[in-house]
């Protein structure tokens, strides 16, 4: 049995984190993004706290982070979740370890609402969020087009 560890993400994790992000992008059902930004852009768009990686026997196998949904003071406790698990590590429960740790850390950091945008055809992510206590609060149709011109829809989940 492998050893699972969740720890804060460090800048030196970026090579592994960006590789995992690119794997998620390649699925075409994890994000609207079509490329991975450079670290400086990613770093500027995510909160300083609540950045985690999950390790499987010492190897970075996934990551999770938050970004604010709105800069206004009244929304200071609301953040959007990003969570990705590497292709060869999927289906092992690592996402559950990572998302539950992120939710705990977010609560300790003063966040009162976490939201997640999940593409409708991403059943594993929907299941993970529901298992971790998120609930579906809405759906947005024809929100974006993918690289093939197909309309995408998303579900919104909150915890």
Locate the predicted segments by residue.
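A short beta-loop-alpha structural element at the N-terminal edge
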Residues: 4-17
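Acetyl-CoA-dependent GNAT
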Residues: 34-88, 99-100
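Conserved catalytic-core motifs of GNAT/GCN5-like acyltransferases
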Residues: 65-68, 115-118, 130, 135-152
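Conserved acetyl-CoA-binding loop-helix of GNAT-fold acetyltransferases
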Residues: 91-104, 127-131
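Conserved small/polar residues in nucleotide/adenosyl-binding loops
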Residues: 157-159
